Structures are given as C-alpha cells and as structure tokens.
Amino acid sequence: MVSLQVSSLPQTLILAFLLPQALPAGVFELQIHSFGPGPGPGTPRSPCNARGPCRLFFRVCLKPGVSQEAAESLCALGAALSTSGPVYTEQPGVPAAALSLPDGLVRVPFLDAWPGTFSLIIETWREQLGERAAGPAWNLLARVAGRRRLAAGAPWARDVQRTGAWELHFSYRARCEPPAVGAACARLCRSRSAPSRCGPGLRPCTPFPDECEAPRESLTVCRAGCSPEHGYCEEPDECHCLEGWTGPLCTVPVSTSSCLNSRVSGPAGTGCLLPGPGPCDGNPCANGGSCSETPGSFECACPRGFYGPRCEVSGVTCADGPCFNGGLCVGGEDPDSAYVCHCPPAFQGSNCERRVDRCSLQPCQNGGLCLDLGHALRCRCRAGFAGPRCEHDLDDCAGRACANGGTCVEGGGARRCSCALGFGGRDCRERADPCASRPCAHGGRCYAHFSGLVCACAPGYMGVRCEFAVRPDGADAVPAAPRGLRQADSQRFLLPPALGLLAAAALAGAALLLIHVRRRGPGRDTGTRLLSGTREPSVHTLPDALNNLRLQDGAGDGPTSSADWNHPEDGDSRSIYVIPAPSIYAREA
C-alpha cells in the first residue's frame, strides 16, 4: 500500500496532476460508474481503515501506447485528478458493496494530435480523515492499466477492470476542442466572412460549413497585425489571406468586380469565372488526413500513426502492442508495415477489443443449453442425447441387452427393458415376487404361479383377491343367476337349503384337497407354486357352478372331484382362485 503525507508532497508532484493551461487540441473524458469489492470469494473489504472515515478520488494518466513502458514514466499525453468523493464511514457488519464516488467527469486535455492508440492508467486513491488519522494521508488502493485504441469523436467505450479485491466500472471517450476537428484533432476550423471557397490548402469544415479547415500548424505565430479572422500562416511571420480578402495583413476585401481563381464561366454578362469542384472536395483523405491540391491531383498530409496515398494504412506496428485480450500480433517491425491481430476464441475486432457471445452461434444441438464458462463452452444436453455438442442420439437400443428374455423398448428420450414375468430391474436381472405387495385381502395366502398369482382365501371370503365376504345366511354369497334361468316364484323357498348343501360340499372339497396335498410328500409346502397338472378354476366358473345348483330341487353334488382343485397346505378350508398377473414388469432405464 502506497501512503503519502500531503504535507510532504512536493509542489512539482501536485502540479503534475493539474491540467495544462495551453490551448488543447482535444479532451479525453473518463466517467467512473462504480468502484467496490469484486465478485471473488471472501468478505468484502472496506476502503477505510480503523483510524476513521475516508473518501475516494481518482487519478488518470495517458501515455503513448508503446509495448514496454515503465510505470514511473511521465504521462506524456496528459494527466488529471478527479474531485474528492463524499465521506465514507465503515459500518461493522455491513459490506462495502457500493462506495460513494466523485461527481462529474475526469477530463484530461491533450495538446498534440490524438494518437488513436494509447495507454490508460487509472489510480484509485483514499484520503484518510478523522482525528485519529494524524493528519490527512493519501493511500493508493488500486491501479489498473491497459492499452486502448480510440478515435476522437467516437462514442463512449465501456470497460470493467479488476485488480486484487476491487472492481472498477468506467466509460471513456476522446473529443476535439474547437477549432480542432478530425479523428486525430489535427485540423482546425477558421471562420471566413466571404461566401466563396476557402483559400489554397484549405477546405470547408465538415461540422461548420461556413468555416475553413486548415492544418493545426497554422496556430504558429503569424506576422504582426495579420487578421485573425481573414488570415492565417503556416510558417512564422507569414500572413496568408482567406478567399475574398487581400493585402499584406488580409484586411482589405477583394472588389466584387474582380475575378478570383476560377475554373468555370460565370453568369452571362459578368465576365467572371465561378469556382468549380476541386480534387479535395469531399475530403478524400481518411483518418483525419488533410488534403492539398496539386496540379491535376491532390496530396494527403496524414496524422501520426497513418500513412498511404489517402492515409488509409495504419502506421501502428506490433512493437506498439495494438492487440488486446491476449491477441497475437502478426506483422513486421518495420514502421512502414501494417499488422493483423489474431484474436483468441472469446474476442473479436481489429484489435481483439470486443468479447464474443459464443452462445449466440447456438453450438449446442438437439435443444441443448449453452454455457459460456469464459475459457470454454459447455453444452448441457437433454435426456437421451450426449456428446460435446449434444450431437449423439442415445434414444436407441444399440448396445443395450435385457437379460432373462426381456425386450428393449425405445421412446420418451430414454431406453427401458420390458421384462418377462418374474423378473424386473433396469436390465431384468432382478427376480420379481408377485406376492411381495401382499395382494390377497382378509388374510388370504398368496402363491406364485407361472401364469400369475393365486390367492387362497380364509374361511368366509371369496373372490380374485379374497375381497368378497360370504354371509352366513347366503343372501349375497354369490351373484344371482341370469334372469332367463330363474325358476318360478313357487320354487324360491328351495334356495336356502340349496345354499346349505353348497357350503357343505365346499367344506368337503376343501378337506379332500388338504388330504391330497399331504399325501404328495416332499415339495408340497413350497408356498410359492401350485401343484403341477392341476386345473385352475376361474372366479367366473365358480359362481356358474353354484347357480347351477340353485336350478336343482335342493339336490346336487359339490365339485366332481377333489383332483380338480389345488391343495395348499393349510389346516383351514380356503377358496383358491388363479389370478392372471401382468405378462411383463417394465421399469424405465
């Protein structure tokens, strides 16, 4: 941290900060938008220390844009100080996110022609205040420096610079001060009183048609008494008259009856020739060059930094370091050779001065989201796509194997396996237990079967999942028979006995089934499958059999054979139904 006591500052240093008093060719203007802690990690710093409040001010230094330049070298193009900002007092626990800044612009006048390429140095200083400060002290907080390229009269240029823990946002521009004009402020506009053309070596000013443009060197001390309005000089002790004036001091108006340097015939009867178009009309010289008429042609006087017949070639070389943001300069070191900047991928422009919005080119395919990380681009792909630019479509079954007879299914931006019965998981490698969810209600026992699952219902319940209760009186034990099969009303009294016989037959069949299972020997108590070779009764066929019993006059037998039923190992009488399970277990990959 640089710390200087104001009392010890030499007068020469303070005078170096002040604006020069000579008539400037133009003014460089700087606008500070914000200064504060940067976006990096950590707690934001306070510009003041523990000794009390402080306030900020800025110093601007302009130097020629050379490739190697010592920080201590003089500000050859000019320097200036801003006003002091409002007093800032640190508040504990409150981050210094927005610091109070000085009002107005920082102006740096320049005397010579504007170079176009220059070095800009901005210093942020702190003035410590308060009783404990032991006298005001200036401390350098931050310093940013960089090369810039800017033409006089161009729009405001914005920039952001970071140094240490601080971040500075600012704008800058260069403009000519009247009577200077042009991209380099190398030409002057002088007033003329006569409506005729400007004299030799002069041309009308573009922004001021009633004035004449002359080389800036015409500020040379002219002959004593030379009219400042109608005369000018290119060398000391000269006095050249503007058109319409004559005399040694350009104070005598030319008679309207005389003819001046004319090219075309005037109106009939005047005997004079009126001015015609000249080779310098329209300013054929680029980049602020000045045009001079020669016999049948013209010559361009180019400002510093440009050359060529029309000043169209930049005289800046790679030795001047014209490429910004890491650009590679290609060109010879000869002052008469031009240069080309090869920019890194993130920047563009003749001097690599503009950042490229690389995501605007939409490099990510198939709806991927582009992320510009500064040093590289990254694409965030949608489901089903992959690759650096999301160019690979993964919505297919290539290379995807489903085990245990499973089938790969495409769709929805993903792949999945449709598994065979008894298997599940991502690749159908996991065995699936259809009884794991306990599908049998009211205490029914579940058995796995090759065609599905089977529920063995507890006494008093029936149905595919044992969901129906059998009432003791038989009122709603089974669905009613179709209307066409009902007997006459006189036979309805036979229904209760028939239901009683049906219940007895069911109990007898269950007992026979239990005896048959016990006689089968080993393997009968697996609890996971039915006996092979048995016929699975359907929940639909059982009510039909019961209803057929109702059509008889109380007579009828139960099931024809106990071999027609499955026999789980259970001491209770249970009703058994085969439940077709889904043929596949599908799980998304």
Curated annotation (Swiss-Prot):
Disulfide bonds join 222-233, 226-239, 241-250, 280-291, 285-300, 302-311, 318-329, 323-341, 343-352, 359-370, 364-379, 381-390, 397-408, 402-417, 419-428, 435-446, 440-455, 457-466. Residues 1-32 form the signal peptide. InterPro entries: EGF-like_Ca-bd_dom, EGF-like_CS, EGF-like_dom, Notch_ligand_N. Residues 552-574 are annotated as: Disordered. Residues 174-213 form the DSL domain. Residues 516-589 are cytoplasmic. One of its GO terms (cellular component) is plasma membrane. Ubiquitinated by MIB (MIB1 or MIB2), leading to its endocytosis and subsequent degradation. Residues 218-251, 276-312, 314-353, 355-391, 393-429, 431-467 form the EGF-like domain. The chain crosses the membrane at residues 495-515. Residues 33-494 are extracellular. Pfam families: EGF (PF00008), hEGF (PF12661), MNNL (PF07657). Keywords: Developmental protein, Differentiation, Disulfide bond, EGF-like domain, Membrane, Notch signaling pathway, Repeat, Signal, Transmembrane, Transmembrane helix, Ubl conjugation. Its main location: membrane. GO terms for molecular function: calcium ion binding; Notch binding. The DSL domain is required for binding to the Notch receptor. Inhibits primary neurogenesis. May be required to divert neurons along a specific differentiation pathway. Plays a role in the formation of somite boundaries during segmentation of the paraxial mesoderm. Can bind and activate Notch-1 or another Notch receptor. This is Delta-like protein 3. The gene is Dll3.
